[in-house]
A protein has these predicted regions:
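Short, solvent-exposed micro-motifs at the edges of structured domains
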Residues: 22-24, 28-59, 64-449
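Polynucleotide-recognition surfaces of large bacterial nucleic-acid defense/processing enzymes
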Residues: 11, 15-26
Length: 449
């Protein structure tokens, strides 16, 4: 038996409902366009027709050996190849700045005023060199908005050597130690803007290969050691001796991991492609350490010297012919409007994890039925600063309520990206943007009956 429920359709009396796009009559919140050309110009999202599911190809080879009755050693090689990975891109925008058309940034030997006046290229030369739209999209009419797309063009490769030593519980001692040496390379990681530490889009939308580098997920070294020591003595002693000197358990855990790779960013649309998310910095080959510098504009005498400021660069583009670093010894220099960024993706290594936790437990036997267990747990026992990257993109812990690094007592303020922009005073000062938990002790008491 079948039952049919007759439900009146809300669109039954609308002629040609599907033929007209499946939208009810009336404007409501729906935008209409006079023709297809206007619709194309207003388009801001692109769905590629050849979407492919991400794939992971894995291979491994390992050997395991047992020795000395209680020990097992395992050594493995692990490889992973990722293809068709998601990449966020703006497919219709092109760089106006190119290797053959850019404003120079000087660290020393700044040209004389006469040489600046004779410069054949100024910022306006670059701004007027094109409309910043890829010719194919321009010809098709997709030139009114940035055309954001998620395309399956990403790739990654991982190679790792993993070792693990295990001692089974014997004579009161259990041990598990592991060390991994690995390298992960990719050309995109944070396509959904889950972090500010590595850009969510590539710097040049027409050259994804230029973003191939150490992945933000690449932690080259990782070592862990976990012990459980159940003190085996006094097991056969009388109750008093066993309760006073025996029944101890100690369980330390140590973890070391190299830091996260991060990208030095200029925080400005230096390559003039309409997007500042991926713009990086200029690397000074003679720079010292991980140091940063801002820039000042170099102008012709077409404007007064007092008007030659960063704030006025776009107001007087015909007079701006270059930039000079405020700190010529810095390794990373901000790329300003029209400058050519030369820094690769993920070239700054963040602080490592260096953590030691420990647990101590003392058991007391009152009677055969009643037992008491007292425990002490110590987290970050050695009180090492653990400036671990955190927080959603665009909001550092300071923005979420004024956190403070408990170890250093330094205020945590602003977005983590602030420590990656060389023109800022907190460049490479991760303690200013990452929280760190101080040593913490936890007591526990358990009664068994």
């Amino acid at each position: 038996m079948s039952v049919t429920e007759n439900t009146p359709s809300l669109t039954a009396n609308i002629p040609n409902f599907l033929a007209n796009g499946g939208l009810p009559p009336g404007t409501g919140g729906v935008t209409t366009f006079p023709d297809a050309a206007a619709a194309r110009a207003a388009t801001s999202t692109y769905y590629p027709p050849d979407v492919k599911d991400p794939k992971s190809i894995d291979w491994t080879l390992g050997v395991q050996h047992s020795f000395w009755n209680d020990y097992t050693l395992e050594v493995r090689y692990i490889g992973t190849r990722g293809i068709h990975l998601d990449v966020q891109s703006i497919v219709n925008l092109a760089d106006l700045v190119t290797p053959s058309l850019f404003l120079p940034t000087y660290t020393n030997n700044v040209p004389s005023q006469a040489a600046l006046n004779a410069s054949p290229i100024n910022l306006n030369t670059i701004l007027s060199s094109g409309d910043g739209v890829v010719p194919a999209y321009d010809a098709a009419g997709f030139n009114g908005n940035a055309l954001t797309a998620f395309i399956p063009a990403g790739s990654s490769i991982y190679h790792g050597l993993a070792t693990q030593l295990t001692r089974r519980m014997s004579h009161g001692l259990q041990l598990v130690g592991a060390y991994t040496y690995s390298h992960l390379i990719d050309n995109s990681t944070a396509d959904f803007h889950t972090t500010d530490l590595t850009p969510r889009r590539q710097q040049d939308f027409e050259d994804l290969n230029a973003d191939r580098s150490n992945s933000a997920l690449d932690h080259r070294h990782r070592f862990t050691m976990a012990l459980v020591y159940d003190e085996p003595f006094f097991k056969g002693s009388n109750a008093f001796t066993r309760n006073v000197l025996g029944n101890w358990e100690i369980a330390p855990i140590y973890t070391y991991q190299t830091g996260e790779w991060m990208t030095a960013q200029s925080g400005i649309d230096a390559n003039l492609n309409g997007d500042q998310a991926g713009d990086r910095t200029i690397t000074n080959p003679a720079g010292v350490g991980v140091t940063g510098s801002g820039v000042v504009p170099l102008c012709t005498t077409a404007i007064p010297a007092s008007e030659c400021t960063l704030a006025n660069v776009l107001n007087f583009p015909s007079a701006v012919v270059g930039y000079a670093a405020t700190n010529p010894s810095a390794k990373y220099i901000q790329a300003y409007y029209g400058a050519l960024a030369t820094t690769g993706r993920n070239t700054i290594l963040g602080p490592p994890t260096n953590n030691f936790d420990a647990t101590a437990i003392k058991r007391f036997t009152i009677t055969e039925r009643y037992k008491v267990e007292f425990g002490v747990q110590a987290f970050n026992l050695l009180n090492h600063p653990q400036f671990i990257p955190c927080c959603a993109a665009g909001a550092g812990p300071g923005a979420l309520g004024g956190a403070t690094n408990a170890v250093t007592a330094q205020a945590v303020t602003g977005s983590p990206r602030n420590a990656l922009e060389p023109q800022r005073g907190i460049f490479d000062n991760f303690s200013a943007v990452f929280p760190s938990e101080a040593r913490a002790l936890q007591l526990s008491l358990k009664i068994f009956f």
